[in-house]
């Protein structure tokens, strides 16, 4: 499918002008999602749940938390026995509306209220609007210490406990790579002469080229696939290593639990899977 032109809001046009008129797709995606005033997540306008823009397992009911809570309880109990005086933390990175945090607290309260009394809840969420929604949803857990912080702040003062990230990795900005004229190219988003958005393609920067080469060698994959046709396009998440390093740095002692859904790389990076994951401009 060939990309088509799309309208561009003034705030985004300002960012593009400041960048010289064009940015890599990853930067465009970051702005669209996380720009503090206008981004989908950054502005706090995202709505998750049956009546919202999309659903996650926790937004549909408490079953997901009920299945997770026995394992989390076992981890926290083990840590509690190892160091009875240590304050423990349950951290959720990217908590959405707060459904999972609320339901986990309720499940743990029912299973071991004495242990829960030693636990604080930490939500990694920068947006003030989302924080207010968390407060409203978590009113029943007002006996539990609750705080918000950034991942960088956690890295400076790592916790003892369990750090959870659920359906977060697929919201990290990605590069879009396209096979054109015999080479793998990086997709950019630019302003056209009419002030709208359109895509263009540029040679891979050396750093991105070396990263792809290294990961493909380690994972036994080939980009592009041998039978890829002209215009074959896929996504590439360069943000993953730095994100995992930052998330791991948030844990002084405990467990980092990351839950997401995807195909194995060998099944994902195939010729028939082109332009499937993102609706592009």
Say what each PLM segment does.
Residues 192-235:
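A short, charged helix-loop
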């Amino acid at each position: 499918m060939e990309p088509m032109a799309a309208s561009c809001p003034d705030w985004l046009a300002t960012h593009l002008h400041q960048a010289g008129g064009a940015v890599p797709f990853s930067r465009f995606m970051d702005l669209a999602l996380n720009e503090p005033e206008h981004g989908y997540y950054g502005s706090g306008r995202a709505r998750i749940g049956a009546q919202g823009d999309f659903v996650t397992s926790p937004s549909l009911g408490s079953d997901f938390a009920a299945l997770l809570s026995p394992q989390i309880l076992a981890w926290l109990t083990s840590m509690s026995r190892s160091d009875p005086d240590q304050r423990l933390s349950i951290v959720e990175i990217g908590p959405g509306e707060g459904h999972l945090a609320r339901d986990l607290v309720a499940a743990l309260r029912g299973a071991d209220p004495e242990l829960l009394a030693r636990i604080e809840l930490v939500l990694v969420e920068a947006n003030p609007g989302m924080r207010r929604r968390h407060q409203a949803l978590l009113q029943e857990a007002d006996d539990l210490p609750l705080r918000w912080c950034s991942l960088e702040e956690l890295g400076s003062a790592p916790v003892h406990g369990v750090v959870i990230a659920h359906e977060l990795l697929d919201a990290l900005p990605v590069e879009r790579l396209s096979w054109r004229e015999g080479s793998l190219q990086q997709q950019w988003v630019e302003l056209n002469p009419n002030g709208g958005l359109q895509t263009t393609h540029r040679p891979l920067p050396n750093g991105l080229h070396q990263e792809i080469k290294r990961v493909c060698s380690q994972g036994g994959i080939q980009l592009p696939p041998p039978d890829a046709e002209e215009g074959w396009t896929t996504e590439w998440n360069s943000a993953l290593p730095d994100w995992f390093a930052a998330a791991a740095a948030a844990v002084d002692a405990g467990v980092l639990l990351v839950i997401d859904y995807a195909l194995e790389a060998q099944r994902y990076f195939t010729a028939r899977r082109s332009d499937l994951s993102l609706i592009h401009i």
